[in-house]
């Protein structure tokens, strides 16, 4: 299977980082939510690739970005560290990888659409 690359995507790393900066402790968003908020609903994978290159994960809290199914997703310091960071912010888990009350702690960014 050949995948076409959409060369029209104009998502800049800085735009992704700026959006993540508004996610408060104790809340999460998804790769898809970030892509939607930036006007590119099919760019969730691109968002993940941008976050892999996050030069300052302490300042830009990319640990607050999870998969759309409520699972952790990747993190440059490993899933266990991502889970521990989220737990210190009040996020709870069903097991090692699934967020409890995912819909309650998720921010979808529609509050900025007005």
Please name every model-derived segment.
Residues 2-114:
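Nucleic acid-binding interface residues in structured DNA/RNA-binding domains
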